[in-house]
Amino acid sequence: MQNSQAFSDSLPKHIAIIMDGNGRWAKSKGKPRVFGHKKGVNAVRKTVAAASKLGIKAMTLFAFSSENWRRPEEEVGLLMELFITVLSSEVKKLHKNNLQLRVIGDTSRFSERLQKKIVEAENLTASNTGMVINIAANYGGKWDITEAAKALALKARNGEIRVEDINEQLITEHLTMADLPEVDLLIRTSGECRISNFMLWQMAYAEMYFTPEFWPEFDEDSLVEAVTWFINRERRFGCTGEQVKALMTAQ
């Protein structure tokens, strides 16, 4: 490592995480699935804090996919209540730490109460200049691309653009998170090795890190390990976890 600036520049700018394994972790403890989801919130706190210390620009957490509605009705209901509780209890802490919260996905299917909480949380943190935290809720990569295609088709029909004007850049500008760097590191917990319809366009060139840890077990050290792997894979710097941790106190 030539200098700390080169090291800092080698960090991922946008980390996406598929937080998998809450239910299996709970089952291994002889607990109901919702117990795992609640413990998963602690892992979110630790991971967000660690990423912010590192100076990561954006983090996107896959909280609830558009396919998750197929889960048992009771579990979905409990997840929605947990979402409301977390938004209510955590948003002031995020705001205090200058973090910006966004919820991406089709929120129209959520209850009015949850939609209101989302709007309040986004409005409170909208002017913050620290790390952007995207919560992907009722989100799917195919949905994201479809919505962009519909928006462009409408503009073409209205004469605002020509069909021949449509290119990759224009599509990118009509996706969610268009103002953020593309994902350069995807982390998925629980040992599963697939992307599950998550940010299909934005992860075109991402490095993908799969760990056997269940999400409730994921913590600061887990993130440091993933980031160290990314730096060594992407930049061939031969850095260590200790060097990554040192950055947390230097930011």
Swiss-Prot record:
It comes from the Bacteria. One of its GO terms (cellular component) is cytosol. Disulfide bonds: none annotated. One of its GO terms (molecular function) is ditrans,polycis-undecaprenyl-diphosphate synthase [(2E,6E)-farnesyl-diphosphate specific] activity. The keyword Cell wall biogenesis/degradation applies. Its cofactor is Mg(2+). Keywords: Cell shape, Cell wall biogenesis/degradation, Magnesium, Metal-binding, Peptidoglycan synthesis, Transferase. InterPro entries: UPP_synth-like (IPR001441), UPP_synth-like_CS (IPR018520), UPP_synth-like_sf (IPR036424). It is an enzyme of class 2 (transferase). PROSITE patterns: UPP_SYNTHASE (PS01066). Catalyzes the sequential condensation of isopentenyl diphosphate (IPP) with (2E,6E)-farnesyl diphosphate (E,E-FPP) to yield (2Z,6Z,10Z,14Z,18Z,22Z,26Z,30Z,34E,38E)-undecaprenyl diphosphate (di-trans,octa-cis-UPP). UPP is the precursor of glycosyl carrier lipid in the biosynthesis of bacterial cell wall polysaccharide components such as peptidoglycan and lipopolysaccharide. Belongs to the UPP synthase family. This is Ditrans,polycis-undecaprenyl-diphosphate synthase ((2E,6E)-farnesyl-diphosphate specific). It comes from Vibrio parahaemolyticus serotype O3:K6 (strain RIMD 2210633). The lineage of its organism: Bacteria, Pseudomonadati, Pseudomonadota, Gammaproteobacteria, Vibrionales. The gene is uppS.
